[in-house]
């Protein structure tokens, strides 16, 4: 009779030890203390050895917006009493990604998106990497598709340059 009680007691103690070790294992796995989670990222290009070419937009940090550089999206959604700022931001992200994918490797600078009443104007500077006919086709394709998606007229204002315009080296 004593043997079954001792074996049951031993099994119970073993179960408690196993539960404690599982509990400490689970608790230690829930806390993530990796250095990757603690990194901060600056929204500017860091100054290096002076061999990194940057454009005018990238050379100035974000706190110079409206002083030395302009807004990349111009609309009235952020005025007091106006709604739809979040929707316009999502639309701007889609437009930027769409144009980056359509004109892959040809963007020389950031895209500026302007909204005037019902008209959507997209200003871009491209590098001449493709034949002119292909540029004209892609511009018409982009205007037509975005006009169909957003149910408003879309106009692309395009300039082309031979190579990427470098403002300075950081």
From Swiss-Prot:
Question: What's a single GO CC term here?
Answer: mitochondrial small ribosomal subunit
Q: Where is the transit peptide?
A: 1-30
Give this protein's Gene Ontology molecular function annotations.
Answer: structural constituent of ribosome
Q: Which domain of life is it from?
A: Eukaryota
> A GO BP term, please?
mitochondrial translation
Protein localization: Mitochondrion
Write the record's keywords in alphabetical order, separated by commas. Mitochondrion, Ribonucleoprotein, Ribosomal protein, Transit peptide
Major localisation: mitochondrion
Q: Give the family per the record.
A: Belongs to the universal ribosomal protein uS3 family.
Q: How does it assemble?
A: Component of the mitochondrial ribosome small subunit (28S) which comprises a 12S rRNA and about 30 distinct proteins.
- UniProt protein name: Small ribosomal subunit protein uS3mA
């Amino acid at each position: 009779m004593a043997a079954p009680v001792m074996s049951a007691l031993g099994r119970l103690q073993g179960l408690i030890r196993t539960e404690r070790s599982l509990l400490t294992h689970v608790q230690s796995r829930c806390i993530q203390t990796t250095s990757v989670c603690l990194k901060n990222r600056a929204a500017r290009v860091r100054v290096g050895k002076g061999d990194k070419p940057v454009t005018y937009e990238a050379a100035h940090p974000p706190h110079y917006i409206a002083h030395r550089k302009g807004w990349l999206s111009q609309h009235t959604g952020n005025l007091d009493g106006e709604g739809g700022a979040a929707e316009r931001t999502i639309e701007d992200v889609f437009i930027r990604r769409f144009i980056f994918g359509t004109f892959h490797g040809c963007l020389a600078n950031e895209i500026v998106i302007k909204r005037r009443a019902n008209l959507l104007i997209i200003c871009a500077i491209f590098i001449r990497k493709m034949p002119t006919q292909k540029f004209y086709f892609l511009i018409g394709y982009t205007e037509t598709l975005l006009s169909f998606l957003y149910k408003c007229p879309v106009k692309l204002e395009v300039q082309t340059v031979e190579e990427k315009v470098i403002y300075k080296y950081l």
